[in-house]
């Protein structure tokens, strides 16, 4: 196989398969490095750790501009004047996201986690109360936009993005198209960075195992079990309860239909945006109101973020527990909901929720360097985490739309 063909295969093949290869090679490198050290004169696993460091730096670089342009584009291009039960559907989106945050917090406190971090800052300044968190949030909102982008002040970035998005809703269509083109360009850069994930995972796993030993794998396995368990609980317990509250009959036939059609496809595409056509077809098959689902499903792909709420909450609280920062459950729920809401606009990007972790971490006084390591941990487990998160997010879009439409139909027939 020539070099160009190898490069094409590696960069255009399945990302999941490539990450698995990087993960396996990282483990193998860590295992054989001690035996090779007398021959090479250095520990190979420690040296390849530079690949992981560069990957983390790339993630930190793209995260601020990614959130900025995607949120502007999402708000500026939002359709105006459509009713069609949207208030009820958006309310379910909000309830679902908040419920996911609660599930994630309870799971994190019930099964405390430790994740291996290479460096831990000594100058942590965790908030002492909810009121202090509000002070931090409000002060960060009024930051200079350029400074916010340069310093990764995600709250300030979000505030300016929302304000600009609202202002641009009344701009000329050509301006909105330009904003969309910019968002698409940034997304392509993000995909380029994420395409390097196998190299980054290879370096991160090798260096982590060389430093922490094989026991670090259990830390990742524990974290993954908490994440997936929370998402499954949300999909199979909380969501059916919400649907039953709306339609007043057995919700599981509808839940299974949405999971088997929408969730299964989204699991492999790992993109809520890419799964929109599947959800549209399913909504049509279910006989839902076209005026409603044609708006609610694309909107849900942007703002319905139950899976992201779980991911950001669990990983952030894992970092909090690792660093020994005391935090009450109400404060954890508040901060987790804030971070989940900030995920708006990033759901169409594979791994997008991971890039929001620095926002939640910053509210606990955790430094950007440590937050970037938490993102890297997320990519290590992302083969299943991101796929399951997307499956939950996307299947819930059509599930809640169907629930509201069926409830309206039941009301009209009563």
From Swiss-Prot:
Q: What's the domain of life for this entry?
A: Bacteria
Please give, as recorded in its UniProt entry, the membrane topology of this protein: Multi-pass membrane protein
Keyword Protein biosynthesis applies: no
On whether Transmembrane is a keyword of this UniProt record, the answer is yes
Indicate the principal place this protein occupies in or around the cell: membrane
Keyword terms = Amino-acid transport, Cell inner membrane, Cell membrane, Membrane, Symport, Transmembrane, Transmembrane helix, Transport
Pfam hit, one = SDF
Where exactly are the transmembrane stretches of this chain?
Answer: 19-39, 55-75, 89-109, 148-168, 189-209, 223-243, 297-317, 323-343, 363-383
Q: What are the GO MF terms of this UniProt record?
A: neutral L-amino acid:sodium symporter activity
Please give the catalytic activity noted in the UniProt record: L-serine(in) + Na(+)(in) = L-serine(out) + Na(+)(out); L-threonine(in) + Na(+)(in) = L-threonine(out) + Na(+)(out)
Q: Which GO terms describe its biological process?
A: serine transport; threonine transport
Give GO cellular component annotations, separated by semicolons. plasma membrane
Where does the record say this protein resides? Answer: Cell inner membrane
Its biological purpose is as follows: Involved in the import of serine and threonine into the cell, with the concomitant import of sodium (symport system).
Q: Which family does it belong to?
A: Belongs to the dicarboxylate/amino acid:cation symporter (DAACS) (TC 2.A.23) family.
- The protein's name is Serine/threonine transporter SstT
The species this protein was found in: Actinobacillus succinogenes (strain ATCC 55618 / DSM 22257 / CCUG 43843 / 130Z)
Question: Which gene underlies this protein?
Answer: sstT
């Amino acid at each position: 196989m020539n070099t160009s063909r190898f490069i094409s295969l590696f960069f255009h093949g399945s990302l999941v398969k490539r990450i698995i290869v990087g993960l396996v090679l990282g483990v193998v490198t860590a295992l054989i490095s001690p035996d090779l050290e007398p021959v090479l004169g250095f520990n190979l696993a420690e040296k390849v750790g530079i690949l992981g460091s560069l990957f983390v730096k790339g993630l930190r670089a793209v995260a601020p501009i990614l959130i900025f342009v995607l949120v502007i584009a999402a708000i500026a291009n939002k359709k105006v004047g459509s009713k069609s039960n949207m208030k009820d559907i958006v309310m379910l989106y909000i309830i679902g996201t908040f419920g996911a945050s609660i599930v994630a917090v309870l799971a994190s406190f019930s099964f405390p986690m430790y994740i291996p971090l290479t460096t831990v800052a000594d100058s942590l300044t965790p908030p002492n109360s909810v009121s202090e968190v509000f002070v931090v949030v409000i002060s960060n909102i009024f930051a200079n936009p350029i400074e916010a982008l340069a310093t990764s002040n995600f709250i300030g970035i979000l505030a300016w993005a929302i304000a600009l998005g609202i202002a641009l809703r009344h701009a000329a269509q050509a301006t909105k198209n330009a904003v969309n083109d910019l968002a698409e360009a940034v997304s392509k850069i993000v995909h380029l960075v994420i395409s390097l994930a196998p190299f980054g995972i290879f370096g991160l796993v090798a260096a982590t195992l060389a430093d922490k030993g094989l026991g670090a794998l259990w830390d990742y396995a524990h974290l993954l079990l908490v994440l997936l368990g929370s998402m499954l609980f949300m999909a199979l317990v909380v969501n059916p309860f919400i649907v039953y509250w709306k339609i007043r009959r057995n919700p599981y036939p509808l839940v299974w239909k949405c999971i088997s059609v929408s969730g299964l496809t989204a699991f492999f595409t790992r993109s809520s945006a890419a799964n929109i056509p599947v959800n549209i077809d399913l909504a049509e098959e279910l006989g839902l109101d076209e005026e409603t689902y044609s708006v609610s499903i694309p909107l849900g792909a942007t703002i319905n973020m139950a899976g992201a709420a779980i991911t950001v909450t669990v990983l952030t609280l894992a970092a909090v527990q690792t660093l020994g920062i005391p935090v009450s459950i109400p404060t954890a729920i508040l901060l987790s909901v804030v971070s989940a809401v900030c995920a708006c606009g990033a759901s169409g990007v594979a791994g997008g929720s991971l890039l929001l972790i620095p926002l939640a971490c910053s509210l606990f006084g955790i430094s950007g360097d440590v937050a970037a390591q938490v993102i890297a941990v997320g990519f290590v487990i992302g083969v299943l985490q991101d796929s399951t998160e997307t499956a939950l997010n996307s299947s819930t879009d059509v599930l809640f739309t169907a629930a509201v439409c069926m409830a309206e139909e039941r009301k009209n027939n009563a």
